[in-house]
Amino acid sequence: MSQIPNHQILDAKTDIEELLSDSKKAPVKLVYAAKKNHDLISEEAEDLESFRVELLSDFAKTDEQGNIIREMGEDGEPTEQAEFESQEALQEFQERLSEIYSDEADLDVRTVDIDSVGEYVAPANWGKNLDFMFKGFETKKEELRGGEVQASTDSIENILGMKSGVEEEPELPLKFSSALYRTYKSLAEAQTQIEERRFELLAEYAEKDEDGVVKTKEDSTRAKFPDEESEERFHEELNEVYNQQYEVEASMVEIGYTDGVDIHPRHVIILDFLLMD
């Protein structure tokens, strides 16, 4: 059994159907696993869509027949966006939907050894969305400083096209993209620890308004401090956080999978801990 986040199931359904629609180019074992998983993933996705529609019926505006009222576009035609009675109703709908999407489903999925399909070049997101189908990764525990965690996170986001402003999703060998996404999840846990500590330090040293919100400098997003000593103490302790060691689980991938990939040399240097000969 595999635990799969509900939001991933929705994306996986789309990617599996795209894979099956152009299956002649894909490895046979990958196509076979996708075909075996299609019905199961589709059923789960349909259940999630039904739940979303039910939530809309509870929180969005409806007509006398119970149909959901859509917002009107500038051209006078209804859009895909539902209309809500208030901002509070919209917020509650989004919170409830976020809760169900963050839950996980236990599914008995068909898997395939990553080394048998890893060279197949596909959209980078497939490495994340279809990750539950892949087995056989070698993993390794690594100790990274906080600064290295941030640099590694930034490098992976650049390679996978996760940065804002990227117009076209990159295509990468499946083993490479999946290894990066798996490691990214572990890095995110360490990054959360760093951010939580940073906010604690801001709460301790920065200026705050009556509601306890940290004040920022004029025309800036930088925190405002009551005096130089407080700002110095903040940066000193923050540097300690960045120099602390954090355990990360790296999914290893052979350096050969970067052949033909448009990747800056500095990313290879930063991500050396997950690359092997």
Provide a role label for each language-model segment:
Residues 1-277:
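A composition-driven surface/loop motif
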